[in-house]
């Protein structure tokens, strides 16, 4: 769905190695499939963030875990890059999962500042956006063959910390 965004259900079924009937039973429309994948991506990202223990782990350990968790599900990351909608972060949205994820990460970057890992002249919110901007850009570039997968975690860490490090 990322590399062939206009693919029909038949083409999508073939790409994942199932029959169209099987895919149709799972999700009868393309829109239903997108919504189901968005839900799965949201759950996966939330679980990855929770597993990093951003609230209590030492900040350097949690930061490395955040990068690793982000890279573990790069296919879903690519899907989210393509299908993420601004309303996911709207305060009036009844589904608060993305707002909770965003707040957890904002709070983590604030903690990194308070503990001297990150500079304080850039807001924690901006650091969160910069971090995920770097990470998503590199994942997307890797999918196009421009950046190798090997060493990606170290590259993200180095590029972020050298610009934002205290």
Task: Identify the function of each model-found stretch.
Residues 12, 37-41, 45, 105:
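Generic hydrophobic, amphipathic alpha-helix propensity
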Residues 11, 61-65, 69, 126-133, ...:
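Amphipathic alpha-helical interaction segments
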Residues 36, 47-75, 90:
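Hydrophobic alpha-helical connector segments
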Residues 43, 90-117, 124-133, 140:
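Amphipathic alpha-helical packing segments from all-alpha helical-bundle domains
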Residues 2-32, 36:
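Helix-turn-helix
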Residues 103-115, 140, 144-166:
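C-terminal peripheral helix-coil segments that are non-catalytic and often amphipathic
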Residues 60-84, 95-97, 103-107:
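Helical hydrophobic small-molecule/effector-binding pocket
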Residues 74-82, 139-143, 164:
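Short amphipathic alpha-helical interaction/hinge segments
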